[in-house]
Each structure stands twice: as structure tokens, then as C-alpha cells.
Amino acid sequence: MVGINWLRPEGYLRLRPMYAKTSNPGVKSNQISVEHLGLVEYKKAWEYQREIQAGVIAGESPNTLILLEHPSVYTAGRRTQLDERPKDGTPVIDVDRGGKITWHGEGQIVGYPIVKLRNRNDVVGFVREIENALIAACSEFSVKTERYCERSGVWIRDTKSERKIAAIGIRVAKGVTMHGFALNINPDMSAYDRISPCGFTDTGVTSLAQELGRDITVSEVSPVVERHVLLALDRISE
């Protein structure tokens, strides 16, 4: 793991960055703290999200955007069906977000916005803002993406095929979000072969590297994603 301290306050583990929380210099965001955590095991990051969400609900923590990568892991949202899981017994973590099964791994930017919504009932509006932010980020690398009616996430749709480049799954409690998005930059795409990502059997998956036909790194893309997501969160969070 990169840049992580494990502390034990009041009898439980807490995940804390070793460096200051930062904001993208291109964005003025007085309300949103940004934490870059590097590579973090999924369950530990999930526990950390819950801790921050509880703090935001209680008014004790600021709105927060976590950006990180995960070691290879499959996670299943609440709508995942038994026949959508890997057939070879590969372990899957069941989580409390919406959506179905997906994969996380290195080469993927994962973002967890934990914010108090200005309109606590506008969950769809929140998802649309995140989608628009990722669409704008991809466009800066000359990759044209779009929303797909009634299918969350960010897609590429052309004469070749329909393929997903970013997945979104969230949970909202007392008007505060958690979980978030995953944008494929240059991951090992073979990990998707074991599942039907997000439950879709009639579409594919892709990455920025595949669409560009060249290597591209998480470190190149992360500041652009951060900038656009912060702009979106400023519009919809308290």
C-alpha cells in the first residue's frame, strides 16, 4: 500500500493519509477535501468510506473525495444475480451499493465521493453529474464518450460496438453519498472475462489505453478526473 498509516484510536482501525489532503490547483473547492490513497485493499477502503460518511452525516467531517486504486477484486452490488457471478469460484465481495457485479484493479482510477447532497433525494442527478464529469475528463484525451439511456456509467458507442469505460455505483444514507466510480485507464482487461460487467451481456468493456491505441497511466489521467469531479461535486453538494 502507498501512503497509508494504520492507527488504532478508541479500539478500531482507522485509515489515514500520511500526507496532507489536497485540492486540484485548477479548482477552487472550499468544501471538499481530496485524499489520494494510492493502492488500498478494497475492504479497508470500504471501512474508511463508512467512517467518513458517518462523520459527514454528523457534521464532524468535511465532504470528501477519495481517489485510489485497488488490487484485483470483484464486488457485487445489491442487484447482482447468482448466475452473474464468476463460474470458477473466484471470490466476490458483496457490498451495499446499487448496481451489479464489477471488477476493480490496478490501472483503474477509483473515486469515492462522500458528500452531503444539496437535494438529498436527487440520487439520479448525482449520478448524472459524475457521468458528465468523466465524459469531460475522457474528452481531454480525445476519447468521445457518452451516457447510455437507462444504463449508468460512461460508454463508447460507435459502428464497432457498445463498450463501457467507466462504472458507477453508489449508496446514499441520510443524504450523504458513498461508493462511486471506476474509470478504466490501462488495467488488465482479461479480468472482465469471468463476469458480465454490471450485468450486461450484450455490451463490452474498454479502457482509455485501448481506445487511444497507446499506453497511458493513472498518474496522467488522475488530475484531470479530479478537476472535473470536483466541479461536479461543487454543483450538487452542500
Specify the residue positions occupied by each region the protein language model found.
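Short, low-complexity Ser/Thr-rich regulatory SLiMs
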Residues: R157-D158, V172-K174
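Two-metal-ion RNase H-like nuclease active-site motif
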Residues: I168
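C-terminal accessory segment of soluble enzyme catalytic cores
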Residues: W155, S190-E238
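Anionic group-transfer/hydrolysis microenvironments
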Residues: P71-S72, R171, A182
